[in-house]
Amino acid sequence: GLKDINGVPIFQVGIGKTNAAMNMTEIILKEKPDLVVNFGSCGNLKKHKVGEIIEVGEVYNNIDVRPFAEYGCTPENNICEIKLSDSGIKCFSTDQIYDNTRVDYAHKYIEMIRECDIVDMECYPLGYVCKKYDIGFKSYKWVSDDGNVDTWEQNAAIGFQNFREHFLQTFFGEY
């Protein structure tokens, strides 16, 4: 695959919270970046179109360890949400794929699905690791689907090309 965009290295952190956190930690310790720019897929929960590039404003974690901490917070670190930008887009990070035909979700999980604009698996752990190491973090998501996983791979190539153009324009002023 592609190794860089305009000399900026590209790293894959994997799918899911655990892989993302582990691999991001290893990358930070080895590369020592000042800024991490995340690009990944997300599911649409509200009004966004497939292929759209979205800058994440706030990211929330799906963890439920009550009574030790409130919903969305990990005990001992008390970081329940991470503000990334003023975009106003709320992202819910969860390893649980949302299926609107299920009825057995926890009440707080459903509240977050209703409150947030998009859902992903990796944004919160990546933001958390960067925050812990005092490294700047921006996250851009492309809307991969509206529940149709059969089109994900086809949409991935389009999403990456859209992100590449957005990245070059945003960070280098070129396209």
Identify the meaning behind each predicted range:
Residues 2-175:
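Glycine-rich phosphate- or other oxyanion-binding loops that anchor nucleotides, phosphorylated ligands
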